[in-house]
Amino acid sequence: MSLPMLQVALDNQTMASAYETTRLIAEEVDIIEVGTILCVGEGVRAVRDLKALYPHKIVLADAKIADAGKILSRMCFEANADWVTVICCADINTAKGALDVAKEFNGDVQIELTGYWTWEQAQQWRDAGIQQVVYHRSRDAQAAGVAWGEADITAIKRLSDMGFKVTVTGGLALEDLPLFKGIPIHVFIAGRSIRDAASPVEAARQFKRSIAELWG
């Protein structure tokens, strides 16, 4: 089982704020996510600028595309994104359109499982050639005190068994990682737990050490 990668989510409102994070920890992570908040705040230039600064890193545009899949994904890929996200409630043709464009750029598409989705949809995504999904505990659910539970673990295992590369996100803390041991997680996303740590560098390194210990 390969080691899960570590992704930092830049849900900053400005590039200036995002740079405060990346200048510290960009070399400690595998993937740099231009979060939805930053995409809205700064547009695709955020993707272009971060990829220019860190060409050796995977840069994800978390656009959460809901419609106009070909148009919006092309905007992201032309800004040199490596991956883009499509929201799970989008029509299957939106996901297919985004994937068609991704292939032109040797990129990839992730289905963001935020909110309601079904296993029937999951099979449609697989049948369409989608390889990646993001299992997401929402920011608002976290704020309401919703913790990771057995239902989450069961769903993540099932997605993995279907052949998806599963990314896990949603207020992940270091102490949450053992919950997922034994599952071939593709990526763990840490946002505030790294960005807001007293030492973001040490926080990122602790995540990497824990991943190596649990999956190595």
Swiss-Prot record:
Induction of synthesis: Induced by L-ascorbate. Repressed by UlaR.
Gene Ontology BP annotations: 'de novo' pyrimidine nucleobase biosynthetic process; L-ascorbic acid catabolic process
Gene Ontology molecular-function annotations: 3-dehydro-L-gulonate-6-phosphate decarboxylase activity; magnesium ion binding; orotidine-5'-phosphate decarboxylase activity
Gene3D superfamilies: Aldolase class I (3.20.20.70)
Pathway involvement of the protein, from the record: Cofactor degradation; L-ascorbate degradation; D-xylulose 5-phosphate from L-ascorbate: step 2/4
Binding site for Mg(2+): 33, 62
Marked site (Transition state stabilizer) residue numbers: 64, 67
Superkingdom of this protein's organism: Bacteria
Amino-acid positions noted as binding substrate in the UniProt annotation, renumbered to this chain: 11, 192
Keywords for the protein's UniProt record, in alphabetical order: Carbohydrate metabolism, Decarboxylase, Lyase, Magnesium, Metal-binding
The enzyme's E.C. designation: 4.1.1.85
Comment on bound cofactor: Binds 1 Mg(2+) ion per subunit.
Cofactor(s) listed: Mg(2+)
The keyword Metal-binding is assigned to this record: yes
Stated role: Catalyzes the decarboxylation of 3-keto-L-gulonate-6-P into L-xylulose-5-P. Is involved in the anaerobic L-ascorbate utilization.
Subunit structure: Homodimer.
Record-stated family: Belongs to the HPS/KGPDC family. KGPDC subfamily.
NCBIfam families: PRK13306.1
Record-linked HAMAP family: UlaD
Protein's recorded name: 3-keto-L-gulonate-6-phosphate decarboxylase UlaD
Organism field: Escherichia fergusonii (strain ATCC 35469 / DSM 13698 / CCUG 18766 / IAM 14443 / JCM 21226 / LMG 7866 / NBRC 102419 / NCTC 12128 / CDC 0568-73)
Gene that encodes the chain: ulaD
